[in-house]
Amino acid sequence: MMKNTHLFAFILCLASSIASAQARPYPGPDVQQLYQHYLEVVSHIAAFDHHAHPGFADDPDVDAMAAPPGSAAFRERETNPELVAAAKALWGYPYNDFSAEHAKWLIQKKAEVKKQYPGTAYFSMLLDKLNFDRGVANRALMPDYLDPKRFPWVFFVDSFLWPFDNSKERARNGDQQVYIPLQEKMLHRWMQQEKLSALPISFADYLKFISQVLEDNQKNKGGIAIKFEVAYFRPLHFSDPTREEAEAIYKKYAKGGVPSEPEYRAFQDFIFRYLITEGGRLKLPVHIHSAVGIGDYFNISESNIMQLENVLRDPRYSGTTFVMIHGGYPLEREAIWLAAMKNVYMESSLMEIVMYPAAFKDALKQWLETFPDKVTFGTDCFPYNDVLGAEESYWLGNQSARQGLAAALAEMVSSGEITDAKAIEMAHAYLHDTAVSLYPSLGH
């Protein structure tokens, strides 16, 4: 055992000396041993989950929208044996499938554990199991079963873009028939919060209403960031209309009438830019869904991350922090270059789920080789149903990300790109430190 320890210490010293010379174009024979080493290292880092939707399957406030019927990517389907592995690891699940009869065991087991961990204790226990320090709760509203100290809230703001008669928007396709009514519901919730029974009469008061919601959610409800999933509803390219143009549209349609598509887009473009400006003023980072999406009608060409470049590189928003949720997947190779902007960060959730660890390792490695101080970890956990809940989703995202990270670091060290010390520093930054640094109110 002592001989093996000395041998591995020698390998690390050798790798460190190589890193000071020219990097090799391929890893060496030590890569597997290095992988095991970094897998051990990253498993002991308490992570900060930068994007997730924790909650129970019967909770309507887990998200501000719902998924229309459609097919999931191969790895996300219930037939994935890794999900059985998740149930075994978390709950001691004794079966090798999720047949209806076997799934009853899992549902009952979770019910028993919930009784053992009442109130906020259940999900806090889950974070402890996963070795998470904290995990963002990106939800419509916060429930009483999540401890806000462990689950800081990121709240949705898309609904402010949809204040008018949306009948024409809903009729565009089946996805919008699901999405738009939920945005209308969310807007009315914000109005009730601010004690409004109808839209404000003036445009100035509508903007004041938006700002008041942001301030209330930050000061009184613990909100740490705002979130857009606007790519599901419309193209991600935002023009730059004047306030006067937006005000004229509001005045025309606030009391009724159906806007034309160009009118609605111009109004939304102004409101989007107003919201990100307010995010900068209030020090609320702006999270934006930047990847491919679910549903039959998600338009990748119009809603991919590069459509945001004119906004992200606009010097007027240099005081706003942007977090690109899901890292622009499947354009993650291009997306990382947006992080050259000092106020733009990448977040890797979804990627580690739709890609297996071998592919995710390559994507994460490219990020770490480019802007390692601008990339963050997330799981995108979601409670799909009573059997496969947020718990199993958390587990798979956590396992995949840590495995991919360990493999990426092993290859980088073995190829002489970085030292062992730099690899460990990168691991802490990706899993925890970089994301936490964006939210001073959380402390470190």
Segments from the language model and where they lie:
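Histidine-centered catalytic micro-motifs
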Residues: 45-59, 285-293, 324
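A solvent-exposed, charged loop/short amphipathic helix patch at secondary-structure junctions
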Residues: 179-194, 241-262, 402-408
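Mid-to-C-terminal alpha-helical segments outside catalytic/metal-binding sites
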Residues: 22-50, 69-97, 104-114, 372-374, ...
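Bacterial N-terminal signal peptides
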Residues: 6-17
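Alpha-helical scaffold segments that flank or form the walls of functional sites
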Residues: 42-43, 61-155, 160-161, 177-192, ...
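H/E-rich (His + Asp/Glu) clusters that bind or coordinate divalent metals
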Residues: 29, 303, 307-308, 312-323, ...
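Active-site beta-loop-alpha junctions enriched in small/polar residues
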Residues: 53, 140, 156-162, 229-233, ...
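Histidine/acidic residue-rich metal-binding segments in metalloenzymes
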Residues: 203-228, 235-344, 359-376
